[in-house]
Amino acid sequence: KMNPAYIKKDELENDYWNITFDDKLKTIEKIITKKNKKILDIGCGPGFFLQQAKKRKWNVLGIEPSTMAANYARNKGIQIAESTFESFCLTNKEKFDAIHSKFFLEHVRDPKQVCNDCYDLLNTNGVICFEVPNDFNILQKIVTDKLNKKQYWIAPPQHINYFSMTSLQNLLKKSGFKPFYAESTFPLEFFLLFGFDYIDNDKIGKKIHNMRMNLEKFLQSTGNNQVKRDLYNYFAEKGIGREIIVYAKKIKA
């Protein structure tokens, strides 16, 4: 079920999220250069990513099982398949040039099957962009070892898969994709090591989230967004960052 407060929060932070959406879409558009292009967002929620894609002249479709989120997206003019990804794959006849998914792969029973299905849904040379939490990373290890914290990122029953940069790339390779770019998001664990203990403290959690947003918005508004992207690309190579984002291309079978 979708929490209305979550939608409200995303609305309020929309200018920030649009920067991250543009980053992703620009990377995808380096490969997908044709005029008439179509993108699928798996678990699109209220459709904010697809709104941004639409502004960039993409034809868009979102898959979303939550009726509330699906209706919200439809009201914003986004085409929605209100179903699970599995059900969608059984009946869908369309092909896509790109597939985006954020915070989906860690919840599914069979991530390999999802990647195989995505391969089938894409046109040749199509692009996939997956974002997942970066768990059991070196900073988290330092936090548990040095600050004596529990493994706070383990979240059953919601999260049943845990990924590193390497394991996510390997998963995609096994399904016939060739990863071509990776980046991470700000390593929120830095804040724990700075002394801001946001674990189980929503007030501090909110504060550090705002700090991270401010940093990225300042870089963007001063024409330094590429500095951020290069930094996050480097973080990804080193295996740090709260989330990891992998871009991969469907190669001919």
Regions found by a protein language model. Name each.
Residues 1-102, 111-115, 184, 209-220, ...:
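Conserved N-terminal segment of class I S-adenosyl-L-methionine
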Residues 60, 128-130:
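Hydrophobic/aromatic residues located in beta-strands of well-ordered beta-sheets
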Residues 130-161, 166-173, 196-197:
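Short, glycine-/aromatic-enriched active-site segment of Class I SAM-dependent methyltransferases
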Residues 102-109, 131:
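Short catalytic micro-motifs in class I SAM-dependent methyltransferases
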Residues 125, 136-138, 186-188:
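Feature marks short, surface-exposed loop/turn motifs that line or immediately flank catalytic pockets
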